[in-house]
């Protein structure tokens, strides 16, 4: 058997020769190292740094009912404004109601084994989802809107 080579302990480098990366990793006992800024997957430092050569990311369009809420508000009360928080609440309210109506209309179409949601399913779902007098007004306004749309 060949004799094993003796392992000599690695000589300690002087402090000034120690790379900056190693210094950053060493932290005092008991403290967590600071989190480094990480880029999302698929993004390079050149794009993040404001390099003009990279492609601009297209803005995702977000559809809201804010302009329509504002138009209705001005029809009903021309002298009253609305705060952005109240507008956001109204937008969420309309999204919730439409989601309930669409879900109910989908159920009705499924029950009747129809592949299509028609104005009849929407009208029935309005009667089921909205209470009493509100449902009557909604049905009459909806019928009026559909008639106006089909006549033009």
UniProtKB/Swiss-Prot annotation:
N6-acetyllysine: residues carrying this PTM: 7, 37
Region (Disordered): 1-60
Stretches with biased composition (Basic and acidic residues): 1-28
Pfam families recorded: Histone
Subcellular location: Nucleus; Chromosome
One annotated Gene Ontology cellular component of this protein: nucleus
CDD domains: HFD_H2B
Further facts: Phosphorylation of H2B was not detected.
Name assigned to this protein: Histone H2B.1
């Amino acid at each position: 058997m060949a004799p094993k080579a003796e392992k000599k302990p690695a000589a300690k480098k002087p402090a000034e020769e120690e790379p900056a990366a190693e210094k950053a990793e060493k932290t005092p006992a008991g403290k967590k190292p600071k989190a480094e800024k990480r880029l999302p997957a698929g993004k390079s430092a050149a794009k993040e740094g404001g390099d003009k050569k990279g492609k601009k990311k297209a803005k995702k369009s977000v559809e809201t009912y804010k302009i329509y809420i504002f138009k209705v508000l001005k029809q009903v009360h021309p002298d009253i404004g609305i705060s952005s928080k109240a507008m956001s609440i109204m937008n969420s309210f309309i999204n919730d109601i439409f989601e309930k109506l669409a879900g109910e209309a989908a159920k009705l179409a499924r029950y009747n084994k129809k592949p299509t949601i028609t104005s009849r399913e929407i009208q029935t779902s309005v009667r089921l989802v909205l209470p009493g007098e509100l449902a009557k007004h909604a049905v009459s306004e909806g019928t009026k809107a559909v008639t106006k749309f089909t006549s033009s």
